[in-house]
Swiss-Prot record:
The protein, known as: Transmembrane protein 186
Transmembrane segments: 80-100, 103-123
Lineage, opening ranks: Eukaryota, Metazoa, Chordata, Craniata, Vertebrata
One protein family per Pfam: TMEM70
Topology Mitochondrial matrix: residue spans: 1-79, 124-213
Keyword Transit peptide: no
Major localization class: mitochondrion
Length: 213
């Protein structure tokens, strides 16, 4: 996984995995706050109260997330092709045009592809691409991938986010968990390969940590 993370960093774009959110201002603390941050990829998001007037500030970004989204969609297409090929394979076997070994091989490849798809989807749907904090400091917006490899935004009240200082995760680890007191979905942040754009807001969300020293 570390080698894959190092490889995908080479494919970072100038504006990676960012997009307008239907009237929601989004700006990264180091860029022009009046500039829309956007992309053409489909997006799914939960409804946020006062979304039309709320302003969010980016404080963390993992540039390689767009590449992982592409890999996720590629894996989904590859799995679909292997599964779709099974019925014709069984038919050809029934007609004596394929051997049993060939059909077993096709079934094995399809099963392996489905297993890998489930594993990749489970991990990638929890890998954080961008973190935002609203201006009032009460809402954390987590941009991550959905099952189809497109961006999805999840909103977490700050009161529900467990600071890193209260967890057993170490900053030297490849992935650090974003956990919630409510026990809802856990996300993963890679501090080794991601970038903290605003340390003040990062500390506000996750607490003072030795990685910021």
């Amino acid at each position: 996984m570390a080698a894959l993370l190092r490889a995908v960093r080479r494919f970072r774009g100038k504006a990676v995995w960012e997009r307008p959110l239907h009237g929601l201002w989004c700006c990264s603390g180091q860029e022009d706050p009046k500039r829309w941050v956007g992309s053409s990829s489909p997006i799914s998001k939960e409804k946020l109260p006062n979304a039309e007037t709320e302003k969010f500030w980016m404080f963390y970004r993992f540039d390689a997330i767009r590449t992982f989204g592409f890999l996720s969609r590629l894996k989904l297409a590859q799995t679909a092709l292997t599964v779709v090929a099974l019925p014709p394979g069984y038919y050809l076997y029934s007609q004596g045009l394929l051997t049993l070994n060939t059909v077993c091989l096709m079934s094995g490849i399809s099963g392996f592809a489905l297993t890998m798809l489930c594993w990749m989807s489970y991990f990638l749907r929890r890998l954080v691409g961008i973190l935002y904090l609203n201006e009032s400091g009460t809402m954390l917006r987590v941009a991550h991938l959905n099952f189809w490899g497109w961006r999805q935004d999840t909103y977490c009240p700050m009161a529900d986010v467990i600071p890193l200082t209260e967890t057993k995760d170490r900053p030297q680890e490849m992935f650090v968990r974003i956990q919630r007191y409510s026990g809802k979905q856990t996300f993963y942040v890679t501090l080794r390969y991601g970038r903290i754009l605003d340390r003040e807001r990062f500390t506000q969300v996750f607490g003072v940590h030795q990685m910021l020293k």
